[in-house]
Amino acid sequence: VYKVNKHAEGLLVGGHPWVYENDILEAPGTAPENGTLVDVVSKKGRYLGTGFFSEHSKIRVRLISRNANDRFDAAFWHRKLQWAWEYRKSVMDPADLDACRIIFGEADAFPGLTVDKFHDLLSVQVLSVGMERIQDILLPALAELLRADGFPIRGILLRNDVALREKEGLPQGKGWYPLPGEAAPDSAVTEITENGVKYLVDVENGQKTGFFLDQKYNRRAVARLAAGHTVLDLSLIHISEPTRLGMI
């Protein structure tokens, strides 16, 4: 159990997902194993949440739950994956599900985990030791969830080639996640459809997780403005074929 000061208590009660090293008043006599779950309480002992402990980061605890009755077994994580996917389906047009962010880190209470879906490939970035420890629970379950919903998943690529991992004591690297009983895909290139435009996405070598999904609505706005015109994009990263923008 980690006891925190009044400042951290206010932040956590307000929804903040992190506990910083300098906000901790009392820690266990023996430090927990790196990446394991610990409880966080106020100065007076009030339960504030449970999260992953990190011995290397200044973010000492990343919360995953504020419910003292939760049991953190595989079923817990499967429910959270299901909720995140169902939420995306509820707020997005069906056509947008071809390429979308499924897991958005702390916003989905998966601290340090990003999962982007590019048609039949998942691009995964793990930035916290807690998520690293349970990825073998999460990733096969997520592939199974999507397949059961009619979305063929050919493979999962780990895009852990980011320096931020070193702050958690994790190595950098990238490569295919070994789904049980499945061979690694032959190619990390896939075709997605966004706003009616087809793009070839290189999930392994594209910037960040492979493609700037957060620019979807900006590209849609540019398409409306550029209709009937020839457009020169001086900062072009991805080229679509066919394209509605008339890019040269």
PLM regions: where:
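Conserved class I S-adenosyl-L-methionine
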Residues: G228-S235
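A short interface-forming secondary-structure element
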Residues: H119-E132
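Non-catalytic accessory regions of SAM-dependent methyltransferases
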Residues: V1-H119
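Single conserved hydrophobic/aromatic residue that forms the stacking wall/gate
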Residues: I237-I248
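Conserved hydrophobic/aromatic pocket- or pore-lining residues that grip, position, or stack substrates
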Residues: D120, Y199, N218, S235
